[in-house]
Amino acid sequence: MTLLLELLHDEFGKAGYHVTLIIDSMNDASSLQSLRPLIDGFLDGLVFATATLDSPIVSELKRRGIPLVLVVRRTDEAGIDTVEIDNVHAGAEAARHLFELGHRRIALAMGPRDTSTSVDRAEGALRWLGDAGLQRSDVPLVFGEYTSESGYSISMSFLGAGRPPTAIIAGNDTIALGVLEAAKRQGIIVPRQLSVIGFDDIPLAGSPLLGLTTIKQPVETMARTAARRLIDRMNGLVIHPATHDILPIQLVQRDTTALYVE
């Protein structure tokens, strides 16, 4: 997320716009109330990277006619420009990778239940595994938060079960960090005894000390596309209905996934 924000800041700066960064999920009534002075004052447009499926901010900005682009996520609100990956496909790719390595006991430690990224990635994984012959009831799924603490607590419950998973799909790379810490605490060797895959390919994922297998998002393209969409909207250069940009993903296999060994 930090890289995305830096790239967005650069893109808008080059176009002559002043950028204000709001560190808030902005997905409840109190957040909407605190944002109103900004909306009423000088807000020309907004790039929203933390929207929930029913975000009141999205509805309010649409009602007021303020240009808005959602990145990474989508909402239930129609008529909003979005720039994201196909998260259902991304979840399926993570499941396919683990299944082809021989894993059959696969668990999902996801982010919030009210975000499209978590819901879609989980659905993609479950659907692919179902098509491959696994029952949904045999694939443990727990929604939590996009934090390492959440990944840790969810994974501790997974790994303490009678038949623990041999592979865990983490909702993002930050959750995966918690999964790895839980495995370490339980004395489980990654990837020999447990394979772990995340999403996003954060800079830390490629560290030689971590080597996290992950699904990479094209963050640079995402930032450029979102900035261009919003700038065009703010300048009145587009009047067509909402555009939904779906960007490609890439499986980056590193050191946290391996062949299942009985």
PLM regions with names:
Residues M1-R96, G160:
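Alpha-helical recognition/docking segments in bacterial nutrient-uptake
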Residues M156-E262:
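Flexible loop/turn connectors
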Residues M1-L3, L21-S30, V83-E93, A109-M156, ...:
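Hinge/beta->alpha junction and helix N-cap segments in small-molecule ligand-binding domains
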Residues F42, G65, G102, G133, ...:
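Conserved functional loop/turn residues at catalytic and ligand-binding sites
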Residues F12-A15, L129-R136, A161-P164, R185-V190:
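Short helix-capping segments at alpha-helix termini
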Residues H97-I106:
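Glycine-rich phosphate/diphosphate-binding loops that line cofactor/substrate pockets in enzymes
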Residues F42-T50, A107-A109, L141, G162-N172, ...:
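Periplasmic-binding protein-like
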